[in-house]
Structures are given as C-alpha cells and as structure tokens.
Amino acid sequence: MRRAAAKALVLVLALTSLGLCLPDAPPALKPYPGTGMFLLLSDIHFDPYADAAIMEKLGAKLREGCPASGSASFPKFGKDANYPLLKSALDEVVATAAENHIHYDYVIVTGDFLAHSFDSRYRQCVGGGDEAYQKFASDTLAFVDGMIAHALPGVPVFAALGNNDSDKGDYAEPSTAFLHSVGQDWSRAWGDLPAGARAAAAASFERAGNYAVPDPAVANHQFIILNSNRWAAHNARACGETDPDPGGQFQWLGDVLGTVKRAGGSATLVMHVLPGIDAMRSSMGQPQSLWTERCTEKFVAELTAYRGVVREIYAGHIHRDDFRILPDREGKPLLPIHIAPSISPIYFNNPGVEIGWYDKHTGELRDYATFKLDLTLPNPTWTAEYVFSRAYGHPRPDLAALKQLSLEIHESSPHSGVGEKWANYYTVGTGPFLTPDNWMNYSCAQTEITVAHFARCKQAAARPRP
C-alpha cells in the first residue's frame, strides 16, 4: 500500500512539474511572480425582452404577443443571455476572486453587449421611432455596464463595440447620438485617467467608436480599442476605392501607434470582429473572410510596420474559445490573437468567462483560466474548466506556444490527443461540434488569414501523407 501511495505521489509530482492539469483539479488562481490578474468577457448579448421587469426598468413595455420568459431560469441553447445568466457570471467572478484572494486590475470586454435581432424585436415588441430606439439601445447597454460596475466597483473596464452594438442595426454604423451616450457611460469606467486623456478618448469614441487609454497597471502601455466592425466583410466597400479608410480608422491607428513607439511604449489591441477566416461559414461552402481582404492587407501592413509595439490582441465575435496567429507581410507569424468565449449560449456553446494573468512589465498575456456554466446539466453551476498552461503543457499562450499548439491540433483529430482536448474547450464543453469532416476548416483558420492561403492549407491537408 505504501509503495502504491509513493508511486501515486511521484506521478502527481511529475505531472505537476510538467504543468499538466489533473482531471477536475481546480486552478491555482494566484498571481505568478511579475504578473497581475484581469477579467475577460465577450459576446454577452443581453436580452432585455426576456424579462418584463427589466423592460420596465428600461422604460419600455412589451406588446401583447411578445411574452417574456421571466427571470427564474437560465436560457436554453440557441438563446441569448438573460438577466439570471449575466448575473450568475458576474457573481462567479466575484466569488472566485474572494475565494482566492485575488484582485482584478481591469476588465476587458470584446464587444456585443446587445442581443441578436435587437432592433427588429424592438419594432415588433415595443414600437417607437428612431429616437426612442436609440435611447432604448443605449440604455440597455448602460444597464449591462451598471451590472458590471456593481459587481466590480472601482475596477476599470475597457470595452469594444460589437457588430450588434448599434442603434442602426447589425453591422450598421451607430449614430453620433448613440456613440455620445455610450462614450459618456464608458468613460466613467476607465479608472483614474488624466483629464486630458479621458477627454481625448471620449472624443475619439464619439467620432468613430475607437479610443486609446493608458493601461492602469502597466507603465507606458496603451489599450487601443478598435471599432473593427468598420472592416468587416459585411461592409463590402470597406478599404476599397470608394471607402479606402472607413472612418479614418487606419490613419488614427497609425497615429496612435506612432505616438506609442516614439515614447518607447507598447500596446494591446482590443476588438470585436477579428481578421481572418470565418471557419463556421467556410465549413458550409466556399471560404469566407471575416474582414474584407483589402482591410486585412492594410491591417497586416500596419502591424508589420509597428512590429514589437503591439504585444497582444484580444477579440471575440465567434462565440468560441480559440486563437489565431496573425502573420506579417511576408507570411511569418507576427502576433497571437486571443479569442474569448461568449457568455451567450445562442450558438449552442456553454457560457464562458476567462480570468487572465498579464505580465506587469509588458502587458502580455501570461496565462488564463476558463470558467463555464454547463447548461447540459439539470442544475447548472459555474465551474473551472481549464488553465492554459496546465491543459496544454506550454508555460504561456505566447506566439511560440500557439505556433506549436496549432501544429499539434492540425496533426491531431477531435477524437485523440491534444485535438480532442481543444475540440472540447472550443465550445466550452458542449460536445462534438468539431468532426473529422470539418476539422481542417477550424485548424487552418488558426494560422491562415486569407482565403487563398486557407484554401491551400486545406488542399495540402487533403493530400495523402507519404
């Protein structure tokens, strides 16, 4: 018995030394030396129409024929987040911080605060003109902001606009009035900024939906929040002859990065829609880009020119726990893109949130833990799903690690090895979304950012191996 116990202890120590996670082992949520901790939220898609009491708080009343489901239970798969789901997510991150004696230095939200079909449901279930809808949309966004602020008082929040976060409809450019209202609300959550920096960021947001602010925890480091919806493929003219620089955002980004570089600083980019391939839609037919290819080319050129200035990119939009490797102009790996899972379960994923470790000297992501609410259970509760370093055996999710991990995934399958693990994490634990038939769509999308390179990756994978 003693010999067996000793062998078990040796095995545990060996696995621990390799940074691997034992089944069901809780993550050690403590700052590593030289790190701080932050919270990452994405794709909340809050649905106020699900609750008549919430609608009343927002000054609206549902018409007959638009029954609210109430606020007693979590939404089902295929639905957006209601009040109980969002509150439970925030309660979880607060409780986790208290239990582990950690402090969030800031919160990043990668966009899509508002539910899908937000505008059409307003017309159907409430009614009213453009001005009334603009107020309702901005008030709903402020309601979500208020829930975050109430849960995490005093913690700075840096958020990007999602494609649904508009008073003009999905992917539509928001009105100036909407941007002004949201900007005033968000600017109050940016923490202790110099008055000039706050005013400049608020003015930039009101003008174009983007802004840059100093990182409250890392010296000489900037958060640059982009309105990447302007570059999305839904806007077919974006970066073309008739609209070469939508909203002047590339000029603005170059100016900001130039200022950061001259100061010897660094930056983190935050956006909603990421560049690259839409893996889900590409698996149903022809390859499709998330941005126009012209905007993608300009973005790659911009970041290549400022190599070493941008240290990290955070994005959302696809409602999955994943990553991308952004190439430079020569096609060589340049930067990691960290993609946060969604809180909304509308695409049949479990709700997820992430707690991250950042480097206090560079601002780079050092590690992260994903937490999930398993809606397949009769009485769902939030649980720790995995920590990157323990799950994959890489010390940090940097460019080198993700290059290796993407290769391991590419050579694996959803039923074995690291591929099986990643496939489960991809949908935050809901089951077999990834299959051998669609595997290469999702694997090639991690490393190939253009339609041509994506197609070549799939063709190469389809050839018989020698």
PLM ranges: what are they?
Residues M1-L9:
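Bacterial N-terminal signal peptides that target proteins for export
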Residues L62-A68, P75-A172:
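Core catalytic region of metal-dependent phosphoesterases/phosphodiesterases
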Residues D130-A149, L179-A200, W291-V300:
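Acidic, His- and aromatic-enriched active-site or binding-groove loops in soluble protein domains
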Residues A233-F250, G258-V310:
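Active-site-proximal segments of metal-dependent phosphoesterases and phosphodiesterases across multiple
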